[in-house]
UniProtKB/Swiss-Prot annotation:
It comes from the Bacteria. Hydrolyzes diadenosine 5',5'''-P1,P4-tetraphosphate to yield ADP. It catalyses: P(1),P(4)-bis(5'-adenosyl) tetraphosphate + H2O = 2 ADP + 2 H(+). It comes from Escherichia coli O1:K1 / APEC. It is an enzyme of class 3 (hydrolase). CDD domains: MPP_ApaH. The gene is apaH. Its EC number is 3.6.1.41. Keywords: Hydrolase. This is Bis(5'-nucleosyl)-tetraphosphatase, symmetrical. Belongs to the Ap4A hydrolase family.
């Protein structure tokens, strides 16, 4: 019985299936953890959602920013961008079923026995685990309710960018969403910077990657995350696992077998068109 952690799939269905075949993943015996951003950019978002949903209790996933954006597109709040290649999913006969399932997925996964937590972008150093759990539940409750379109309409934005237990309403929900799904850099006090996307080496002072700032969760738990493909899975402290290695951009899809910490990779079926800055079919 093995636990496999896989980084952002981004619609790369063929690579996902090839990687699972490589590690001999067996639903019902093994468990698959996914860092979110199941959809967008790659050609197979529909197949990815259908497959992941079919795994039932054999999968544990977290929502990423692209998954939330898909829900906003489906709700008529955001525009369907051609580069996201979501039209086959949005027009599928089972789109309602798939997307209503998706919006009921969590932002945070915790395994106390393994001392493992997973969130798409990571865990802000301003939170302890109890706060992270409560914050995740706040957003999950709204997403799974009939009022979820109102939240999706208000989730876009970069403020507030500093946590306070006194935050209320949509501002609180927006901060939580950004921390779980969009965070990369923080100021030394843990305040989020939502603008910088470069590599840690190129970030302006005093910004630091969120995982470079000591926080209570990282003191007790391992943290697995995706979202930050330019890290290429490198440069994190012990116990912090960056799993997005840019499959949809021509990189690889990465899997970590938790029990022995062995990595497996599946090369992308796509290549990066440097002139366009977009992944195109090879």
């Amino acid at each position: 019985m093995a636990t496999y952690l896989i980084g952002d799939v981004h619609g790369c269905y063929d690579e996902l299936i090839a990687l699972l075949h490589k590690v001999e993943f067996t639903p019902g015996k093994d468990t698959l953890w996914l860092t979110g951003d199941l959809v967008a950019r790659g050609p197979g978002s529909l197949d990815v959602l259908r497959y992941v949903k079919s795994l039932g209790d054999s999968v544990r996933l977290v929502l990423g920013n692209h998954d939330l954006h898909l829900l906003a597109v489906f709700a008529g709040i955001s525009r369907n961008k051609p580069k996201d290649r979501l039209t086959p999913l949005l027009e599928a006969p089972d789109a309602d079923e798939l997307l209503n399932w998706l919006r009921r997925q969590p932002l945070l996964q915790i395994d106390k026995e393994k001392k493992l937590v997973m969130a798409h972008a990571g865990i802000t150093p301003q939170w302890d685990l109890q706060t992270a759990k409560e914050c995740a539940r706040d957003v999950e409750a709204v997403l799974s309710s009939d009022s979820y379109p109102f939240f999706l309409d208000a989730m876009y934005g970069d403020m507030p960018n500093n946590w306070s237990p006194e935050l209320r309403g949509l501002g609180r929900l927006r901060f939580i969403t950004n921390a779980f799904t969009r965070m990369r850099f923080c100021f030394p006090n843990g305040q989020l910077d939502m603008y910088s996307k470069e590599s840690p080496e190129e970030a302006p002072a005093p910004l630091k990657p969120w995982f470079a700032i000591p926080g209570p969760v990282a003191e007790e738990y391992n943290i697995a995350f995706g979202h930050w493909a330019s890290l290429e899975g490198k440069g994190t402290p012990e116990g912090i696992y960056a799993l997005d290695t840019g499959c949809c951009w021509g990189g690889t899809l990465t899997c970590l077998r938790w029990e022995d910490k062995q990595y497996f990779v599946q090369p992308s079926n796509r290549h990066k068109d440097l002139s366009e800055g977009e992944a195109v079919a090879s």
